[in-house]
Regions:
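Short, basic, low-complexity termini and linkers enriched in Ser/Thr/Gly/Pro
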Residues: 297, 302-312
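Long hydrophobic alpha-helical segments that form multi-pass transmembrane helix bundles
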Residues: 179-261
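Loop-to-transmembrane alpha-helix initiation sites
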Residues: 164, 185-190, 319-325, 348, ...
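Structural signature of hydrophobic alpha-helical transmembrane segments
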Residues: 106-120, 157-166, 229, 243, ...
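C-terminal ends of transmembrane helices
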Residues: 44-50, 124-135, 172-182, 262-270, ...
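Central hydrophobic cores of alpha-helical transmembrane segments in multi-pass inner-membrane proteins
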Residues: 97, 116-130, 147, 167-175
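Generic transmembrane alpha-helix motif of multi-pass integral membrane proteins
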Residues: 146-156, 261-267, 329-335
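N-terminal signal-anchor module of multipass membrane proteins
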Residues: 1-117, 410-412
Length: 412
């Protein structure tokens, strides 16, 4: 009954927003709200198309659902990391059976994340709506995912004004100047993170993150992440199990491999994300990690000139790279972006392998920035069209050769 009432109300005011109506200049904005509430009844007008039950809106919502486990765990981990160093936390952390402590950690993290999500969506959607009105285009649902991801991949104490600048930069420079959703060649969420990293490096260096020293963070300390400890030449104090679960300092929602794996399962089952890219990123990272493990047994003095802490890095078991930093999150939710990734099947393997290789290589060799996943994905975003071009050109040459052989055989 409520749905029918909303439908009738929308149909009643719709003439005001169509051509010739009082608010025709707001047609794009009206259509955005209408299509968000209901599936549009428009069909394609020309060309042959494959009918599919999943449109862009459902695809974006499915990705958001896949992000929910990482978001919920990230909220809880914000409260948990605060509780570990707080002097006035109201509930003891005496195990998973303490439901009150678990819920309070989740509530504490929710209160920290809510303003960041609000700023991300308000700023980003405002710019999206403005560009849609200027261009007289419909508002696409692409920012549903981007606005959700950006707060997940930055430190929880990123000032809201810095977050707003990063979102604006990502939407305008990373997407709209190239034509909007589907036309961008760089992942907008990573563009936002890159903006913060290069504009405010002390807050995005990847080695230390904020941990509250009292309940509301009026006094605070910083805690080293596993990657930060490695950058200092120290083996990570957290166990592999802790890093796998995610109970470690880090970016807001990137720490739990379990939560990320749940989202990856949903994306793979629904066919939204490419399993080739996910698997190849993992294989590339493992290959590079094993290569460094082999180099650690050779005792080459030349390697120490690249990074003074290199010996600690290269002796680290290769699978640790999957558990630290944003490797897992990037492999599942960033590298698989269908707009910025390679499109051909062979290209996806090449694209993913190079991301994994460069991510681990940048971590180990680059002493200035412990995390390399962001830079690796952005680099391969730039080369994805070239990879596809080379793969397609190779396929064309092979087909031409087969056609030539066939024609010669027929002539005989």
């Amino acid at each position: 009954m409520k749905t029918n009432s909303i439908r009738r109300f929308i149909d009643k005011i719709k003439p005001n927003f169509t051509e010739g109506g009082k608010f025709a200049w707001l047609q794009s904005t009206f259509e955005a709200f209408e299509t968000f509430a209901f599936t549009p009844n428009r069909v394609t007008k020309s060309g042959c198309h494959v009918r599919d039950a999943i449109d862009l809106k459902r695809t974006m919502i499915m990705v958001v659902i896949a992000l929910v486990p990482a978001m919920l765990f990230g909220m809880w981990n914000i409260g948990y990391q605060t509780a570990l160093h707080s002097t006035d936390w109201p509930y003891p952390l005496d195990g998973c059976h303490n439901v009150a402590a678990l819920l309070y950690c989740l509530w504490f993290g929710f209160l920290r994340m809510l303003p960041m999500l609000a700023v991300s969506y308000i700023v980003g959607l405002s710019i999206e709506f403005a560009f849609a009105q200027i261009r007289h285009h419909e508002v696409n649902e692409g920012f549903l995912v981007t606005g959700f991801i950006i707060p997940m991949i930055v430190p929880v104490t990123t000032p809201l004004w810095q977050l707003a600048l990063a979102v604006a930069f990502a939407v305008i420079i990373g997407k709209e100047v190239f034509g909007g959703t589907g036309m961008n060649f760089l992942n907008p969420a990573l563009v936002a993170r890159a903006f913060l990293f290069f504009a405010y490096p002390t807050r995005m260096s990847g080695d230390n993150v904020w941990i509250a020293a009292d309940l509301w963070g009026t006094d605070a300390i910083t805690g080293a992440t596993p990657l930060g400890e490695l950058a200092a030449g120290i083996r990570p104090t957290a166990s592999a199990l802790d890093m796998f679960i995610g109970t470690i300092p880090g970016s807001t929602c990137e720490t739990s491999v379990i939560a990320i794996a749940l989202g990856a399962t949903l994306l793979l089952v629904t066919g939204i994300a490419s399993w080739r890219i996910m698997l190849s990123v993992i294989l590339g990272g493992g290959l590079m990690g094993l290569t460094f493990n082999v180099l650690s047994t050779l005792n080459l003095p030349q390697l120490s000139t690249l990074n003074p802490q290199l010996s600690t890095y290269i002796q680290l078991p290769f699978y640790y790279h999957y558990l630290m930093g944003g490797f897992a999150f990037g492999a599942v939710f960033m590298a698989t972006d269908p707009v910025t990734a390679a499109q051909t099947n062979i290209g996806k393997w090449i694209y993913g392998l190079l991301i994994g290789i460069f991510a681990v290589m940048l971590r180990v060799i680059n002493p200035a920035y412990p995390e390399g996943m962001m830079l690796a994905i952005l680099l391969m975003n730039c080369f994805a069209p070239l990879i596809d071009h080379c793969v397609i050109a190779r396929n064309i040459r092979m087909r031409q050769k087969r056609a030539l052989v066939t024609s010669k055989a027929s002539a005989k």
